[in-house]
Every structure is written in structure tokens, then in C-alpha cells.
Amino acid sequence: MFSTAEGSVRRCFFLGIVLAFVFIMYPIKKNMKLKPNHILIYDVVLLVVAVGVYFYQIIFKEELIAMGRRIGTPQIIIGIIAILVLVEACRRVVGIPIIIVAAAFVAYTLLPMGADKPLQGTIYNLVYTTNGIIGTPIQVCSTYIFLFVLFGSFLEATGIAAFFIDCANSIAGAATGGPAKVAVISSALCGMVSGSSVGNTVTTGAVTIPLMKRTGYPPEFAGAVEAAASTGGQIMPPIMGSAAFLMAEMTDTEYADILVRAILPAALYFTGIFLMVHFKAKSIGLKGLDKDSLPKGKDIFPKLYLLLPLIVLVFMVIQSGTFTMAYSAVVACLVAIVAGMASRETGSKKVVMLLAAIPLLVYSRGEG
């Protein structure tokens, strides 16, 4: 990622790298089992082709601009390959249905409805302009979402998820139906960092679901509570799902405004789940956890420094007239790295986090 790079260059670079990781991480068949650190030859070929076709647009950017819509046969072939590798990547990650929908819309553009060369125009618009593949969603991903996901990863590496679960246990663990309430509160707290329903479920569910089952909740209810609570991570400020960033970009609204307006819906969502859990626990006579087994304030207080990166991020995002979103995320990442250096949870990850700080410092100089 280059903070000073032109928009289309940044988008192509980002997409090429993302596709490379897709072909490394997702096998051609979902159930295919591969040896650790083993990549099949055709995945390597697809990786190289994917990087090549999108980096081609970076290297020959000026020539492509000069051609405009009058692209030649080589550019059409490269464009078709760019579409096909993207389709294959989507198939591996999302599945067939989205491919069918996309193919239907692309096929519609190829209908001869007055255009002399519909294929040439379609390839040009889809591949070589910011109205197609490298449009607004990729722009938002490469500029904002990537950095906010990186921030969440750094923060999770510091052990903040365990800190949030300890806080939730301390607050509600001893209450009626304590474990389920802990699941709701910890999911809300972790949702502030992850912005992901799946990530939230994996992080908190590994602790809260077994805890709920041990205290008498039916297994299906325990799973449902965690799934419902973790879904709220998508709408829990300050880091919400990707849709929030797209909303800000497409409506030309400051992310800070969306962040503030999301507080009430998120609060109502988690309050509703919390009350449902409370009444369910009352109806089946479930009690809370033993107070002696719960974290004490003296155990939680020394870890309050883990909240500093989150506080810095919220402060800078609210000051949207002073700091850009990207700059706010980068600074928050750097603060998270500093917090990680002080945390025992990071362990061997400290070296990786320090190495990651170098490009982030370079990026911040460009954004600042």
C-alpha cells in the first residue's frame, strides 16, 4: 500500500495482492486437504497470472489512459483474463450463486444495443476504469477497511479479547444467567474492535458457549445466543462492518457521523438480546457463576492500557476535519503496537508487530 499512490494504482496493487492470498489460502475445492505450507502448481499459476494482469495496469497506466476506449486485442485478452481470475477467486471464497448473478449482468452488457464493439467497451469499463472492478468498493477496501482490519488484528494480538471477556465476567458473571449475559457483553465489547460477525463468534464463542452449556443452558440456545450477539459486531462502533465504510463513501458522509448514529441502534440491539437472555434464565431457573471464580477489579485495572488504541482511534475519527480516516487508522495501529509491546499476551508476536510498524510509519508520513 502506498499512501501517495494514485487511486487506480493503489486499487490494482491491493487487488493483485488480495487475489494472490486467495489462491494461496483457498484450495480449488472446499473439502480438499493439503499438506501444511503446500501450494498446488495450478494455484501458483493463477497467483502469478492474477498479480500480473492487475500489475499490468500499474506498469502501463499512461499507455492505457492514452488509448481510452480504443483498447486493442492484447488489452482485451488481458482484460478477459483479469475478469476470469477474479471470478475464480470469488467462486473459491463466496461460492457459485454470486458468480451466476455477476455473469448475468456482464452478459447483458455484451448485447449489441447500438454499440459497434460491445466486447471492447465492456472490457474497458469493467477492467480499465474506476467504474468497474476497481471501483468504489475496492477503493474503500484499499484505503480504509484494510487498515481498520489491521488495527483490529494488532489489538487482538495484545490480548484485548481476553480482557473484554474478563470485564464481562466481572460485570455480569454472577447475575442470573450470568454466562449468557457474559456472552452478550463480551460480544458487544469485542465487536467494537473486530467489526466482523464471524471473527467475533470465534473469539468470544470459544469461551462463552462451553461456559453456558456447563451452567445448564441447552446447547442450541447457547450457540444461538453467541451467534445473535456476535452478529451485532457489524453495527457496533467504532469499527463496524465494511458496509459502514461503503455507506460513508457512497453517500459522501463523514464516517464520524455514521459512527455516532450507529450508537443507538447498536445499544438497542444488544439491550434486546440481554433482556431476552435474562428472561430465559429466569424461566428455567439458571443462576450466575460463583463470585469467587470471577475476575476481580484488581486483576482488570492493570490492563486498562489496552483500551488506549481504541480511545485514540475514536478521538481521531471524531476529529474528521483534522485527520483523514486512513491516517487515524494508521496512528491507532502504531499505538496498538506500542500497547502490544507492553502486553504479555503478544509473546513472539512482538517481533512481527515491530516489523509491521516500519511500513506503517512510512504510510503515516504520506497521509499526515
Predicted regions and their residues:
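Transmembrane-helix bundle segments that line or gate the permeation/cavity pathway
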Residues: 56-60, 201, 214, 234-247, ...
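Helix-loop-helix module between adjacent transmembrane segments
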Residues: 53, 151-157, 186-200, 228-235, ...
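Conserved, well-structured core domains of diverse proteins
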Residues: 1-66, 76-80
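Membrane-interfacial loop-to-helix junctions in multi-pass transporters
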Residues: 73-77, 131-144, 170-184, 215-221, ...
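Hydrophobic transmembrane alpha-helices that form the pore/transport pathway of multi-pass ion
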Residues: 165-233, 243-246, 252
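Long, contiguous bundles of hydrophobic transmembrane helices that form the permeation core
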Residues: 260-366
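Alpha-helical transmembrane segments
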Residues: 8-16, 139-149, 256-272, 324-333
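Hydrophobic transmembrane alpha-helices of multi-pass solute/ion transporters
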Residues: 5, 34-38, 64-150, 167, ...
